[in-house]
Amino acid sequence: MATISRQEYNNLFGPTVGDKIRLGNTDLYVEIEKDLREYGDEVVYGGGKTLRDGMGLANTMTSKEGSLDLVITNVTVIDPLLGVVKADVGVKDGKIAGIGKSGNPNIMHGVHPDLVTSAATDAISGEHLILTAAGIDGHVHMISPQQAYACLSNGITTLFGGGVGPTDGSNGTTITSGRWNIEQIL
């Protein structure tokens, strides 16, 4: 069996078990704990890659028979229940159908039964991306910096709104009034 270096593998398929990923421009790192894919049988989108008819796409299954509508390939998933895992994520009818190994079960080993891909499946290459559950709050009265901590602890990662603190203007509207006030809330 042919082998490639860890660096080559990382360049092609993204990080795997034991690799650490820096989160944005912080000093926080996560380590991949588990890889739910099969080494050497990864689904990859692109010219000359495996996500094509008869290879990674099952040519014997249709969308009506259960193949995915969308697959996110080789993505790093950060989840409070699963931990930090490398996997494919399948979407069917607008909902996550499964997290694991996707592909064509006719020729690929270890394909999760809910993650079969076909010609009806669209793809997002997730090789160097992180996928995590998150919520968005689109109407926030920003009255204190502590709101961000409360939001994060409840899964809200994105806030839209305005305000500069516990003032009547911030309580009544979501408008941020001026540069100096913005600097004070940050």
What spans do the regions from the language model cover?
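Metal-coordinating catalytic core of metallo-dependent amide/deamination hydrolases
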Residues: 2-66, 166-186
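A broad, low-specificity signal for short, low-complexity segments enriched in glycine/proline
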Residues: 34-37, 119-122, 159-161
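Histidine-rich, glycine-flanked metal-binding segment
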Residues: 41-70, 77-133
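Glycine- and acidic
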Residues: 72, 129-132, 164-170
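Redox-cofactor binding/interface segments in oxidoreductases and associated redox assembly factors
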Residues: 125, 137, 161
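Histidine-centered divalent metal-coordination motifs
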Residues: 129, 134-143
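Active-site loop-helix segments enriched in His/Asp/Glu that coordinate
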Residues: 140-186
